[in-house]
């Protein structure tokens, strides 16, 4: 069988059926398997909407078919939506029933989880910015407790001196106490500290006596220091144990080298050099151990086609190629073959074992077959790693894996065949009749009993036979009991998380021969502290310094404060080199010697496992997809845990249907190409630095990204004047920081760049997905200027007020009938957004749109001398455009009402030839470290196409649209 057969995909389009309101009511997919190309199955997902156009329910193809015979089968999701579009109740077969209610400012007020846990938020009162003060939690049969407290800085001299005015000073949360001590002008924290909760304590921040709360905390306080440049990039980080990381960047803002100084030691180089292509892709990186990694890309598609890691000629240990991976793709980007030219072809039991993997897909791009090599003595895949083998002393055999899925995308069977090694087996997974919940058949092979292995929120309560799982009130895995003993202490592994659901500690207890061994891990900024106790005696303390910037590689320094193993050098450096999806395949030490080598099956099992010593192998914590592997065999991704032996998540997606109706499916069943960075949604792998969120922001880098909004509002650095004019009310220009929530409601959003999103909360849809996985840095202020209520809104930013190294990004969101005008006059930037009312017969700016723009400009510039009663035609807008030194207009002009000037700085987004066109206007204002200010506007014509329904962020149901840019231009304003 050929790996890619174009005939297989003929006649298998994806079809969306729209109703007369433009809503997708059917999604048709045509399924054909490579083994049975003559058979084709039509799979239909159904969606319904209420009379107001809000989504009311969805059902996937599998449940839709079952519902025809069994009326008790429920849709995957049902929504009850308020008139405002806010989803008040979500009923899901995977994640249960969730209630949520926002306040008048669209802030979370109350939520009730599927397990009956309620959370309540409290905010500042009137005449304050409306920031959150606390979050309370109530479990069934328990008293309500406050699990989060926020204390915000005022404006006294000491706080201003540390740039803390308006910032959160102290945050008591589920992990302990986080404090911000000082912040740079760019927004980068200069010093911050963390004080963990006692192991025996629970977060209960009742009352107002902070001294009483401190009794719940450990006496240890861990403080991290940073020094940043004018662009907000970290130059030096000193971790809580005194280890220092230093970084240097090139003129484009990319990392070029980095160094590490362990506490009390000499500085050593980690990254010698990094080179990049014009597109910003890494071409070559050389590390301090002399190992060189070279990346190659396909010219036409820019897909990664080669990763070569080697000790080059002239290295003190001699030349050696560690890996030379070559990738072959089909036309849509599925990997067909991976060849490792660094490995030799071997022979075992009369079979030829080639160092390559091949893959076959169905018409839905799900992996259905994989060929590769494995260790000849490897047992059936389980939660445990296979027996370790010495390096270069392995016999290999070929394997074939076949994967079978149901029509909802549930992986139901993994059939493993290795004939030469007599190692063939089948892993079956039992899927519930009523949901996408599923467990290994070793737990049950009865589809009617699957639901009993999950709680109401879709969290699995048993891992393997006899291994129980416990979850906390916030839906986080709290405890695994791998061995339960009657009348004796059980083995266990427990976890604790911060307010962002990120793990901050892990404790594993194991009983053996009347002795208790306790292993603890504390996760700090750039550091892990691992300890081992035998009984009450501290036996070992290992500090793992995690290098934040090292190219694509992950680098760790292993420093033993106590109990250093004799076979391992103290302060050993471990460089981990990855593959296309970020899996750690090679570990090399600081002298360029190989420590370990690991190869993986699709979906994450270990096929090859070699190391030079047992102890060094046991210290390897990160493996498949670059994620941490726990003693349970689970991989920790950040928001969820993953079962590699079942190819499934342990719990329903906390982000809802961000990746489809199946909340348990792993990376769309395409694990060779796709990588999930945090357990929420898959994408293509990109190593994210712990120091930087995104490379230097430029106006050109915004092309094709799609409209943006704010996920939640927060304080920003820049001051500016804001004015709005509604149909029945005027608001005079005022500093935006002095506005009440009512003054800015539905018109102005401000936030730091980390809170950027593609989600339009008021319209209940996602304008693409770009910003969901690519947040900006916090040295960028976001300003989203909506129109007034059948009126207009405007802002005036003094460019001199932008601080060096900071940027301001201004947008109107998605323009579907409004006008956005931007311009610079002298040292001031202006943006005017005219609203939509009842459109005129001749133009689409709004009921009084042209006049509103003129009046808004006069509000912001009283001496502008602009006529307040212009002719109501779009050509009149040229008067405003010409008033500015440089400016732009994005408008929606019907045929016959266009602006009669053909210029790059004017965009009519009502262009014929495309459907569902929208306009985008991004203005980027930047001041570099030398104090030079630049201002530019990107004008873009885009299309929003029906793509998916019911993408959700938490409990809020939303529609996902696909954004495609059709044409764009950048206009320099200054």
Swiss-Prot record:
- Region Cytotoxic necrotising factor domain, as annotated, extends over 699-940
**Mostly located where?**
secreted
| Signal peptide positions on this chain | none
Which residues form the RHS repeats?
165-179, 290-304, 322-336, 354-368, 398-412, 490-504, 570-584, 596-610, 630-644
User: Is Cell membrane among this UniProt entry's keywords?
Assistant: no
Print the keywords alphabetically: Repeat, Secreted, Virulence
Gene3D superfamilies the record matches = Cytotoxic necrotizing factor, Rho-activating domain, RHS repeat-associated core
Known activity regulation?
Toxin complex is secreted when grown at 25 degrees Celsius or less; at higher temperatures the proteins are present intracellularly but not secreted.
Could you state one GO cellular component term attached to this entry? extracellular region
**Subunit field text:** Semipurified toxin complex consists of at least YenA1-YenA2-YenB-YenC1-YenC2-Chi1-Chi2. The Yen-TC:K9 subcomplex is about 26 nm tall and 22 nm in diameter with 5-fold symmetry and 5 copies of YenA1, YenA2, Chi1 and Chi2; the chitinase subunits may be solvent accessible on the exterior the complex. The Yen-TC:K9 subcomplex has no insecticidal activity. The native complex with additional YenB, YenC1 and YenC2 subunits is 16 nm taller and is insecticidal; the toxicity-conferring subunits are present at about 1 copy each.
Q: What does this protein do?
A: Part of an orally active toxin complex (TC) with strong insecticidal effects on larvae of the Coleoptera Costelytra zealandica, Acrossidius tasmania and Adoryphorus couloni and some Lepidoptera larvae. The TC has an endochitinase activity.
Tell me what this protein is called.
Toxin subunit YenC1
